[in-house]
Regions:
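Conserved N-terminal beta-strand and adjoining loop/helix that marks the start
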Residues: 1-21
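Residue-level preference for beta-strand/loop junctions
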Residues: 6, 32, 64, 78-80
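A structural signal for short, well-ordered beta-strand segments
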Residues: 10-12, 51, 68, 84-86
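Conserved Nudix-box catalytic region and its N-terminal flanking loop in Nudix hydrolases
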Residues: 16, 20-57
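A short coil-to-beta-strand element that immediately follows conserved catalytic motifs
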Residues: 61-70
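Active-site-adjacent beta-strand/loop module that shapes the phosphate/pyrophosphate-binding cleft
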Residues: 72-93, 103, 125-126
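NUDIX/MutT-family hydrolases
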Residues: 94-126
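Charged phosphate-binding loop/patch that engages nucleotide di/tri-phosphates or the phosphate backbone
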Residues: 120-138
C-alpha cells in the first residue's frame, strides 16, 4: 500500500492589545499577496516550532498565549494547515525579500484582496477568543 504524501504548514492568527490582527503581504503569494503569517514545517519540526520560526525569520516577532485554533486540509495541493491563535504587541517589519509589508488591521479594515477563507477564519477566531484581553477578544 502506498502512503499519501502531503505538506504541512503552520500559520498564526495574531492579535495585538487593540484587537487588530497581523497580516503579511508576500511578494510571491497569489492574488493580492495578503495573508495570515506562516510557512512550511521543516523535517522533524513540530507545528508550533515552525510557526514561531517563520515569525522570527520573516518579521522578527515573538508571540505569547499560543493555542491551537484549527486545522484544515486541501486536496490541491495536498496540504494540511495547522493554525494557531496568539498574541503579540510589537512593531513589525519585513526581514526577508519574500515579505513586502506587515500590518495590523481591525476586522472592518481587512484588505479587500485577503482570501475569503482566511477572512472567515479571522472572524471565527474573534468569536472564539480567549487569552489576549483586547477589545473584541474577551
Amino acid at each position: 500500500m502506498t502512503q499519501v504524501r502531503f505538506t504541512v504548514t503552520a500559520g498564526a492568527i495574531i492579535f495585538n492589545n487593540e484587537g487588530k490582527v497581523l497580516l503579511l503581504k508576500h511578494r510571491f503569494r497569489a492574488g493580492s499577496g495578503w495573508g495570515i503569517p506562516g510557512g512550511f514545517l521543516e523535517v522533524g519540526e513540530q507545528p508550533e516550532e515552525a510557526m514561531r520560526r517563520e515569525l522570527r525569520e520573516e518579521i522578527g516577532l515573538e508571540v505569547d498565549h499560543v493555542e491551537i485554533f484549527t486545522s484544515r486540509s486541501f486536496k490541491k495541493p495536498r496540504q494540511v494547515e495547522i493554525l494557531f491563535r496568539c498574541c503579540a504587541d510589537a512593531e513589525v517589519k519585513p526581514l526577508t525579500i519574500e515579505v513586502e509589508r506587515a500590518e495590523w488591521f481591525s476586522v472592518p479594515e481587512l484588505p479587500a484582496g485577503l482570501p475569503k477563507d482566511q477572512r472567515a477564519i479571522i472572524e471565527c477566531s474573534i468569536e472564539r477568543a480567549s487569552a489576549c484581553g483586547a477589545k473584541g477578544r474577551d
